[in-house]
Amino acid sequence: MKKITRRSFLTVCGAVAAAAALSACGSSASSTTASSTAASSTAASSVAASAAGDLSGNVATGGSTSMKNVIAALTEGFAEVQPGVTVSYDPTGSGAGITGATDKTLDIGLSSRALKADETGVTGTTIALDGIAIIVNKDSKVEDLTVDQLKQMFTGEITNWSEVGGDDGEIVLVGREAGSGTRDGFESIVDVKDTCKYAQELTATGAVISAVEANPLAIGYASLSAVGDTVKAVTVEGVECSEDTVKDGTYKIQRPFVFVTNDSAPLSEQAQAFFDFATSTDAADLIRTAGAVPVNE
């Protein structure tokens, strides 16, 4: 496989970023399996074609907006071995991704949360882990927060930055919209589900980052893979949000990136080949380049 350069990776990311502006990230958490029954059902039939690199057609994916960079990197890497296959990505949110896999309008649904117990007929396969970074304005004096402080801040018990080591000023809470996988992950882990006193509820990860960048009194949360240098990610109980701390579990606010496949509908050869590529050790560096933590390496 050719080396994926920063220039080529950013080119692909730019292509999907425009679509992601209209998106949302899906719903709540439960359990995710280590393998996909539906995805594996056609693996044997696609091996020869996949190895030869002569597959063609489209693989329809969609769902989580937080997985944008990961899907962009995987798509570019897969094109190196299967140039005849097109992988489409519709950033509609995790809930829509799961629904798409369930009703077979998508080959592979994308979710930034584990499947819930009542989401049946589909299987979730974790391809990566993602830390949910707690972000503040770059001018904020606050460097570290505890989970308990976050709970009190987002429920309105703590309302002034001076109470957590910052300058005097009313805390502005910025979050995602109801149904977002990022929101569900944050609220479940911090134990603030449905009790947050948001000043703004935004429909995309990038919008949250932009809002925090623009307001010195704001605090929000965003996927580690999406956080750049326009905002500051604080440590949580002294632990930085990074690949190492997410992987070893010391960073507490994290969630899975999941491929969702239909249990009753075998994947097409090209979709199976993409699934196998994305869950192989060959994809680990691509996933890491995209800012997430690979689980297969």
Residue ranges and their predicted role:
Residues 2-4, 26-30, 34-297:
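Exported/periplasmic ABC-transporter solute-binding proteins
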Residues 6-10:
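N-terminal export leaders
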Residues 14-18:
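Hydrophobic helical h-region of N-terminal Sec-dependent signal peptides
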